[in-house]
Amino acid sequence: MKKIKNRMKYLPSLCFLLLSPLSLKAQSEQPIEVKEAYKYVGETKIVCGRIVSTKYLKRASGGPIFLNFGRDYPNQQMTGLIWFGRFSEYFTYKPEKFLKRKNVCVKGYISEHEGKTQMEIRTEKQIKLRE
């Protein structure tokens, strides 16, 4: 009986160690609002907000599509960047038309380009429409 009691004292620590990774994963899966995205540069997050405008530069190298979140360019809170020339096969719709003025959540790595927060989007699976 004494051996069991001695082993039981380690049970809370063991539970904590086993469940901590689950807790950390759950935290990283918690959506954040687009206005907070700049705080998470260098991390992979789910970011939610309204795409207020889009721009497709068809003739530019890589065919970039810019999704401006929160506010119009050049004051956007975050830019979603789709290199449509490389990743068009991963979309069943035209992102620059379909996503304009939509409220969405996007999952990806948050980076910064020329002082602006951005996220590269490679597939429509990263994008979920929000009610």
Language model features: what each stretch is:
Residues 24-131:
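OB-fold and OB-like single-stranded nucleic-acid-recognition modules
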Residues 2-12:
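Bacterial N-terminal signal peptides that target proteins for export
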Residues 12-21:
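Bacterial N-terminal signal peptides
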